[in-house]
Swiss-Prot record:
Its main location: membrane. It is an enzyme of class 3 (hydrolase). One of its GO terms (molecular function) is undecaprenyl-diphosphatase activity. The chain crosses the membrane at residues 2-22, 44-64, 85-105, 113-133, 163-183, 188-208, 223-243, 255-275. The lineage of its organism: Bacteria, Bacillati, Bacillota, Bacilli, Lactobacillales. It catalyses: di-trans,octa-cis-undecaprenyl diphosphate + H2O = di-trans,octa-cis-undecaprenyl phosphate + phosphate + H(+). Bacitracin is thought to be involved in the inhibition of peptidoglycan synthesis by sequestering undecaprenyl diphosphate, thereby reducing the pool of lipid carrier available. Catalyzes the dephosphorylation of undecaprenyl diphosphate (UPP). Confers resistance to bacitracin. It is found in: Cell membrane. This is Undecaprenyl-diphosphatase. The keyword Transferase does not apply. InterPro entries: UppP (IPR003824). Its EC number is 3.6.1.27.
């Protein structure tokens, strides 16, 4: 029944809206949830669905940060306009590693890593990394406390960290936040740049998935279009809340709790995979 599929789409949209911005891996969570709750659709649609519903999350970022990201915003001084263009240049530079590395390798990683064990391992590894980095930095002051002070070189290397998220379970936001902190930025700068970098990255990735889906000879019927729209709209609404939560959270707390969550979830997934294999 279509109503059941739409309820599932709402549920997946909630998962996407929450996990896209928290450093816990949205794709990993969607794949995990679909072990137990699946859309009654073919594999090609589900693979495309998992990526394209990110469009709702991207639009949420664009809405929240529209004034900050718009160089033509009325009332901006010449200096503020210059800083906005510089920010966009940093974002473009940070996209280069993904264009050169992640895009060509995407299909291979999708074929070999999109199942439970690699997701679990990635969750645990990066969970440990978050805890270790936060302990290492506990007594250190970040070198970069404003986006305007971030160098183009730093932006490029943050983009290199983003490439790591090609492995499901890594988390795009987790990889870029972790990379930014390692490179000396504050948590606030790391989170902000992650949000901004998501706009071209996720638009491009979602677009590629949609085009590939169509070029492979698939088509969308009315029900599938409705499922995508409902899931994306839900992801948009939930993302508005998740982004505001994370921006407020990082002003007062570190990312240790997310590291612990990743380790616990990854461990449970390994146990589940073991029993599923044995029994």
């Amino acid at each position: 029944m279509l109503i059941i599929e739409l309820l599932k789409a709402i549920f997946f949209g909630i998962i996407e809206g929450i996990t896209e911005w928290l450093p816990v891996s949205s794709t990993g969570h969607l794949i995990l949830v679909q072990e137990f709750i699946r859309l009654n659709q073919d594999k090609a649609f589900i693979e495309m669905f998992n990526i394209v519903i990110q469009l709702g999350a991207i639009i949420a970022v664009m809405l929240i940060y529209f004034e900050r990201l718009n160089p033509f915003q009325p009332g901006k001084t010449a200096r503020e306009v210059q800083l906005t263009w510089q920010l966009w240049l940093k974002v473009v530079i940070a996209c280069i590693p993904s264009i050169l590395i992640a895009v060509p390798l995407d299909n291979w990683f999708e074929a070999h890593f999109y199942f439970m064990v690699p997701i679990a391992i990635a969750l645990i590894v990066y969970g440990i990394a978050f805890i270790w980095i936060e302990k290492r930095n506990a007594q250190q002051e970040p070198a970069v406390t404003e986006l305007a002070r971030m160098s183009y070189k730093t932006a490029f290397f943050i983009g290199c960290f983003q490439v790591l998220s090609i492995v499901p379970g890594t988390s795009r936001s987790g990889a870029t936040i972790l990379g930014a902190i390692i490179l000396g930025t504050s948590r606030t700068v790391a989170a902000d740049f992650t949000f901004f970098l998501a706009i071209p990255t996720m638009f491009g990735y979602s677009g590629l998935k949609a085009v590939k889906f169509l070029l492979d000879g698939h088509h969308l019927d009315f029900a599938q279009v409705l499922i995508l729209l409902v899931a994306s709209l839900t992801a948009f609404v939930v993302s508005l809340l998740a982004i505001r939560f994370l921006t407020d959270y990082v002003k007062k707390h570190d990312f240790t709790i997310f590291g612990k969550y990743r380790i616990v979830l990854g461990s449970l997934l390994l146990i589940y995979s073991f029993f599923k294999f044995v029994f």
